């Protein structure tokens, strides 16, 4: 008996040591980056004079700092209307990421927009669904050239689903481009867009390029595919990811370290979850992707050449200068039909074509489906994904296939090097629709980085798209 106990202990110590070795260099490197960032900002210059106000960012509490920054931002003088090159609706989440979004706007984004003669209306969000409610009810969206978001993917998700509640949602989606300045822990949409144009995937390069595009009068936008999502009690528009199991838990359970570690929180929690690995019983159903003649194409346009309303008007006008009744009816009913795939080429899970449907009921370690290449700056999760393409890149890991916990650690670290899909225990397939049914409790269902309260989630590709700031002329 003693020998058995000793053997078990030695095996446990061996795999724990292996996990620690695998993660140690990565964690040390990321924590070194955090310390260097903290050191670079620790010396107080006390005051910065900007936009008619004085900003001190290190000698008072976060609440006092946010209050003063908000006051300075809202009291700015916009460029004269006759000189204006464009107009943006700006949403700032003061609590996203490490909590520096207000400072970023006051000291960097605002001055650059002023210099470019771009006017802006600022909304500083005060809590969940603030941006959603603004975009759901705002009557003058048409006057803006675009929306600029200082936060992470979560606020983009909230904004899109606010627009989804409007009667003119499917006119607004492609004609109101969204710009992003990374201020949250997760910036998958931005990284996916920038990587297409060769931006290096590190924090400094992503921020610099995002700032350049967001504040440039020659900014261009292009199409990003939109997906239909249905849960137990609500429907959503989605653009990025659906997760359940390991990676969803890492994302949500590390939220408590958001301000102290930033996006490095994922690495630390990844180590913890690899040591304390869980399995989850669920049923996964999916339809393999078949294009069937549908070839998505990207619509690239200048952000400031026209307002949103002008782009909407252009989309209505046909060669004879009128809009057909059938077209208007189609646009009005798209909102009602959003719970179904808006495509003749794809079918919802559970349709009559059962021979093409795959069903897996088992114990899962991880289910993660993405529609874009990146979920963060570390490396592409789905290297073959394209912005405008309407296929879903589904990957999953079964408990019976993983072997040891060390393999999970290798999987998480392999994402950064684009080799995770080559691991033998990782299954991946391109699908047009999928359905997840949660059988056992214990994990979060995460949609575009946000927790959704549901035991069933259905996702389907559509022909709809949004537009996102992507480049400069």
UniProtKB/Swiss-Prot annotation:
Catalytic activity, as annotated: a sphingoid base + ATP = a sphingoid 1-phosphate + ADP + H(+); 15-methylhexadecasphing-4-enine + ATP = 15-methylhexadecasphing-4-enine 1-phosphate + ADP + H(+); 15-methylhexadecasphinganine + ATP = 15-methylhexadecasphinganine 1-phosphate + ADP + H(+)
Domain DAGKc, chain residue ranges per copy: 83-233
Keyword set includes Iron: no
Functional pathway: Lipid metabolism; sphingolipid metabolism
EC number: 2.7.1.91
Binding site for substrate: 151-154, 251
Record keywords, A-Z: ATP-binding, Cell membrane, Cell projection, Kinase, Lipid metabolism, Membrane, Mitochondrion, Nucleotide-binding, Sphingolipid metabolism, Synapse, Transferase
Top EC category: transferase
Annotated Gene Ontology cellular component terms: axon; cytoplasm; intracellular membrane-bounded organelle; membrane; mitochondrial membrane; mitochondrion; neuronal cell body; nucleus
Binding residue positions for ATP: 93-95, 125-129, 158, 184-186, 258, 265, 448-450
A single GO BP: sphingosine biosynthetic process
Active site feature: 153 (proton donor/acceptor)
Coiled-coil boundaries: none
Cofactor(s) demanded: Mg(2+)
Gene Ontology MF: a single term: acetyltransferase activity
One Pfam family per UniProt: DAGK_cat
Broad class of the protein's primary localization: membrane
Tissue expression per record: Expressed in the majority of cholinergic and GABAergic neurons, body wall muscle, excretory canal cells, intestine, and hypodermis.
InterPro entries: ATP-NAD_kinase_N (IPR017438), Diacylglycerol_kinase_cat_dom (IPR001206), Lipid_Phosphate_FormReg (IPR050187), NAD/diacylglycerol_kinase_sf (IPR016064)
Outcome of swapping residue 268 to Q: Disrupts location in axons. Loss of neurotransmission
PANTHER family on file: LD11247P-RELATED, SPHINGOSINE KINASE
Function: Catalyzes the phosphorylation of sphingoid bases to form sphingoid 1-phosphate (SPP), which have both intra- and extracellular functions. C.elegans contain specific sphingoid bases, which are unique or different in structure compared to the sphingoid bases found in other animals. Two examples of these distinctive compounds are: 15-methylhexadecasphinganine and 15-methylhexadecasphing-4-enine. Required for neurotransmitter release from neuromuscular junctions. Acts by recruiting the synaptic vesicle priming protein unc-13 to synapses.
Protein name per Swiss-Prot or TrEMBL: Sphingosine kinase 1
Organism of this sequence: Caenorhabditis elegans
Gene coding for it: sphk-1
